[in-house]
C-alpha cells in the first residue's frame, strides 16, 4: 500500500509539473527591439524548507538561467531550437541544489534567436514541494524586473558586448543599479499554444581547439586553427584600456579595463578556421594573452 501511495504521489506530481509547463505566462521588456539581449530577474521568499524545486522556461529565443547567482543552465544556446526559428520552445531545470530556505533569486539572460521583434520573450514557472509535503508555484508576471544586458546583436550578424557593464551583479541577491531596471510587460498568448519541449536535444561543447599558428601585420593578428569548426573563439586579454574596442571576427568587444578579461560570443556561433583580430587606436597585439576555439555540436541526451 505504501509503495502504491508513493507511485500515485509521483504520478500526481508529474502531472502537476506537466500542467505547469504548458501554463504559459509571457512577459517581455516594455520596449522590445530586434537586437537587444535582456536581463530578467525576480525574488521569491520561502518560509519553509524546500524539498524539490524546478524551473520551466519557455521562450521564443534563448535563455540562460541563474539561481542565487549560480548558473543552472547546462548547455550553450539553450533551449535547443532550429537556427533562425522563433516558435516557443521549453526546457525544465531541477534547481533543488541551488535553492535556499529564505529568498530565491531567479535571473534569466534572454536573447532573441536572431535579430527580429517578438513580444513573447519569456514564460517561466517556478514550482516544487516543501519538506512538509505542501507545494508551491509561481509564474512570470509584471512583478518581474528587466533591463538591457551588456550584449546585443550587431549588423554583421554577430554580437557587440560591452565589458564595462558588470556581468555578475545583475543576477545577485542584492543589486546596486535598481534605477536601471523596470517592470516587465505582460504579453497575450495564443489559444491552445504549446511549446516544443527540447530537453532531449542540446548544444554542447565538443572540444577546445588550440590555434596552429598566427600571423601579425602591424596590430592585426590572424589565427589559423587548421581544420574548421562551428562554434566561437574565446579570447583572453590583459592590460586592455577601459573602452578599448576589439574586433574578433565579426564580434565587437568593448573592454572593461580590468587587468584580465575574456571576450567570447554568448548566443551566436560562427564557422571558424582563420580568425582575424584587430582594434581601435588603443589596441595593441600584446593585449591578447590567449585565443581558444570552442567547437559546438548538437547531442541527443536520449542516445
Residue positions per predicted region:
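Bacterial Sec-dependent N-terminal signal peptides
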Residues: 1-21
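Extracellular/oxidizing-compartment recognition motifs
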Residues: 20-303
